[in-house]
């Protein structure tokens, strides 16, 4: 957790395994605090937007990218954007294409907010990134549950085959979770068990945000 007692904006980092429930928690907190803060004062940024640009590579090399390894992320740009937002400056967030396996020519314009929710699997693995965060959260969902959710999602939403999802899980998703993501749980201020429907944990996170904002 950041040591700043009066942050210019509050940055919440929600990490955990792929399909652990990070996006559900982020969207739930966002939706429920919109009514209190005004939707223009709270926003979500996905770590996925900061995968490195691979336009200089051919498709054969792009598809070999290990998206579960910290080296796949453009950490420098993400940290630069967080610093800019904290100083009151807007940023243009890259738009990443999973079809082309690289950034598109489009960007998402993002204005400074009172509360920014970051969500992504690798957020707590980088010390410099953790230093920019007000509250760090780890969603601690059993890995077998995450795999089932990921399998269903990737086959339904991304048109992938059962074999390709299982192969990716075996080769990169599970090993990278054990090597990088699970150890990063030690840096979390809040650990949320049972995934995105843990109502008590969500209420605790909202209460912490209110406290940092000076609201009761």
Curated annotation (Swiss-Prot):
Pathway: Pyrimidine metabolism; CTP biosynthesis via salvage pathway; CTP from cytidine: step 1/3; Pyrimidine metabolism; UMP biosynthesis via salvage pathway; UMP from uridine: step 1/1. It catalyses: uridine + ATP = UMP + ADP + H(+); cytidine + ATP = CMP + ADP + H(+). This is Uridine kinase. It is found in: Cytoplasm. Pfam families: PRK. One of its GO terms (cellular component) is cytoplasm. Gene3D superfamilies: P-loop containing nucleotide triphosphate hydrolases. Its EC number is 2.7.1.48. GO terms for biological process: CTP salvage; UMP salvage. The keyword Nucleotide-binding applies. Belongs to the uridine kinase family. ATP binds at residues 16-23. CDD domains: UMPK. NCBIfam families: PRK05480.1 (NF004018), udk (TIGR00235). The keyword Translocase does not apply. One of its GO terms (molecular function) is ATP binding. Keywords: ATP-binding, Cytoplasm, Kinase, Nucleotide-binding, Transferase.
